[in-house]
């Protein structure tokens, strides 16, 4: 069994816990590699075990951080590697265990007392080309000029679904329904469902409403306004795009895999939503 370790880089407690996990696994006789960025912020790991995250080829990744750490892993790894996530963030919608339970969780993982929770992702094509990361949470099309709305049309499976004047449009997975989409007025969607959400950001008039569509759907977005936009993926990747761009969002063939110790969704998600608000 081979493990990879990735930690939140701006939090010393996360880096120290990552080292303790690394030491525990090495002493236990397992092969362990460490993310290069983690090492650069805490250079106490054996340098021979340090490789770029993009080159991880392991059985499990131990992620010590918040949702942002998980999103970084998902954007950079080339394989769908199961992630055991330790919460060193704020709310931690995606994380599984608290820091105090880290070594108990590792023991259960080693003993095979877990299951794999698979989550859908969405893939973005820009003028027919896929050159940006898949999104675990959402793809957001945003106004390139703060205070100026954008005018766009979006189509679902070839049919015009809506013409929107708004600050932008969010195309979200069920996992992302508790993030940007919810802030824009979208619903909570059980992450086990195979659906896609389309949520306008502050539309004018407010007749443009959020939609939940089948996960097999294709969403095509074109701009009516002659204005540059920003494409944002999971709040991690940003790119300015010209007004004549055509954007397509579909379900990705890849999935995110989480190590879980319980199949319970509720009340975890509902409690975290209340904490957030």
Curated annotation (Swiss-Prot):
InterPro entries reported for this sequence: ATP-NAD_kinase_N, ATP-NAD_kinase_PpnK-typ_C, NAD/diacylglycerol_kinase_sf, NADK
Root EC class: transferase
One Pfam match: NAD_kinase_C
Catalytic activities: NAD(+) + ATP = ADP + NADP(+) + H(+)
GO CC list: cytoplasm
Residues reported in the UniProt entry to bind NAD(+): 67-68, 72, 137-138, 148, 165, 167, 178-183, 202, 236
Molecular functions (GO terms): ATP binding; metal ion binding; NAD+ kinase activity
Active site, UniProt feature: 67 (proton acceptor)
Protein name: NAD kinase
Native source species: Pyrococcus furiosus (strain ATCC 43587 / DSM 3638 / JCM 8422 / Vc1)
């Amino acid at each position: 069994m081979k493990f990879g370790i990735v930690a939140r880089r701006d939090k010393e407690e996360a880096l120290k816990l990552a080292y303790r996990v690394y030491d525990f696994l090495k002493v236990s006789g397992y092969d362990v590699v460490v993310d290069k960025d983690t090492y650069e912020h805490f250079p106490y790991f054996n340098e021979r075990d340090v490789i770029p995250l993009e080159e991880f080829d392991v059985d499990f990744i131990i992620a010590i951080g918040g949702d942002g750490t998980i999103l970084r892993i998902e954007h950079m790894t080339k394989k769908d590697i199961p992630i055991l996530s330790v919460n060193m963030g704020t709310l931690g919608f995606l994380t599984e265990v608290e820091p105090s339970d880290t070594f108990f969780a590792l023991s259960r993982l080693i003993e095979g007392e877990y299951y794999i929770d698979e989550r859908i992702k969405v893939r973005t094509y820009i003028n027919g080309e896929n050159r940006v990361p898949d999104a675990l949470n959402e793809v957001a099309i945003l106004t390139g000029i703060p205070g100026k709305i954008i005018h766009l049309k979006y189509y679902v499976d070839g049919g015009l679904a809506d013409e929107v004047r708004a600050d932008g449009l969010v195309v979200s997975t069920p996992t992302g329904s508790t993030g940007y989409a919810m802030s824009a007025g979208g619903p909570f969607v059980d992450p086990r469902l195979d659906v896609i959400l389309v949520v306008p950001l502050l539309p004018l008039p407010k007749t443009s409403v959020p939609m939940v569509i089948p996960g097999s759907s294709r969403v095509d977005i074109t701009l009516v306004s002659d204005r540059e936009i920003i494409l944002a993926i999971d709040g991690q990747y940003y790119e300015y795009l010209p007004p004549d761009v055509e954007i397509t969002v579909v379900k990705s063939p890849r999935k995110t895999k989480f190590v879980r110790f319980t199949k319970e969704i509720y009340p975890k998600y509902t409690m975290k939503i209340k904490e957030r608000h």
